[in-house]
Amino acid sequence: MSDAAGPSTPSSRKRSKWDITDDDSLSPKQEQSLIKKRPKVKNIRIHEPEQLRPPNKPPLLVDKSLLSYSKYVPPRTHHPPLTSSRSVYSYERLNQIEEGSYGVVFRAKDKQTGDIVALKKLKLDEEKYGFPITALREINALIACRHENVVGIREIVVGETLTQVYIVMDFVEHDLKSLLTLMPQPFLQSEIKTLMRQLLSAVAHCHKNWILHRDLKTSNLLMNNRGTIKVADFGLARRYGDPVGLGGMTQLVVTLWYRAPEILLGATTYSTAVDMWSVGCIFGELLLKEPVFPGKNEMEQLSLIFKLLGPPTQLSWPGYAGLPLSKSLNLPIAHAPQFRQRFTYMTVAGIDLLSRLLTYDPGKRITAEEALQHPYFSESPPPKHPDLFSSFPSVAAGEKPRRKPDSPAAPHGAAKYQLLTELDLP
């Protein structure tokens, strides 16, 4: 049996590394014992209009338990073809790259083509109510946002149990957080322009396809050895054009250091501007080689923002006073923004772009499309060609182990937050 033909039984193949990582998973027999049987209910008749019912056709029988959800199911005349998933054993596991809140990422080799890929094993062991919403969002967003600067999704593969599901993605050698830690000096201005232009291009494409990323940070920006940026980790992404329920949108998004002030102050509705604030934080981090707002909690995060931008006013942020947490804050004494003092060597155009990204009022914050046209990218020095970037040893490929960068994790409660139900589906 070929590797691509589907999962093989344990007796028909040797034990592999994929089995080692799943010792804590339930066996198929144990999984079946956990499946609750639906209580039996009597079928009832649905009264169809006589003129719509073909002659000699009996009344439609349906399960009474479904009536609370829908009284009419439109007929389906076409069923799209479904392609069965390949087995994870079609890949040779090479090494583990990282483990996050929502999955474990491995580097692997396709046994048929020899391609090196990244496999993200979804954490399904603790799921009690089906497939996790974060995984559905990530798959949906990766498919909707195919772009040269977004990590590519290849396929979904499965193991031998229902808890073994993997997303196969392009392997990228580095992430910007690790590179900033490794590099003795910050990126050059010409290199920062290239990185920022690629990031803005990817974000503009996502927003054009109605996708909010909601967790942009340097550790989620991958870069290959040819200087090309790939935006990754869409686990917190959602479609922002969807209707918002009465509870609003969840505030448990965006890693703290990159979280927009409107979210920190309890806003229940937000837009693409939250991603643009994160882009501004990334821009500043590339310039300083350290995070701009490394707060330990929400209050300290706001304090660091107020220190750089000055406290918000009715003029700089007209909607500030209406946010849920605004009245509980004691604002510092008003002062002018400190961009020039913090970013000493930036040009006037560079400071202008940074300040327009880190703007209090979400409605005035620059968009990705507008930022791509900013004069900063056309002034000297010009953006460096990606092929001219220096190369570095890849930690993900196991070339040179080093200390893991100190970076906060994404909000752990987001996957289980009560608003992430039908109010926040992709």
Residue ranges with predicted function:
Residues 312-355:
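C-terminal lobe substrate-recognition/regulatory segment of protein kinase catalytic domains
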Residues 104:
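Conserved N-lobe ATP-binding subsite of Hanks-type protein kinase domains
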Residues 1-88, 425-426:
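Intrinsically disordered, low-complexity regulatory segments that flank or precede the catalytic domain
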Residues 163-175:
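Conserved short submotifs of the Hanks-type protein kinase catalytic core
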Residues 195-196:
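Activation segment signature within eukaryotic-like protein kinase domains
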Residues 382-426:
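C-terminal intrinsically disordered, low-complexity extensions immediately downstream
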Residues 116, 121-146:
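Conserved N-lobe beta3->alphaC-helix segment of eukaryotic protein kinase catalytic domains
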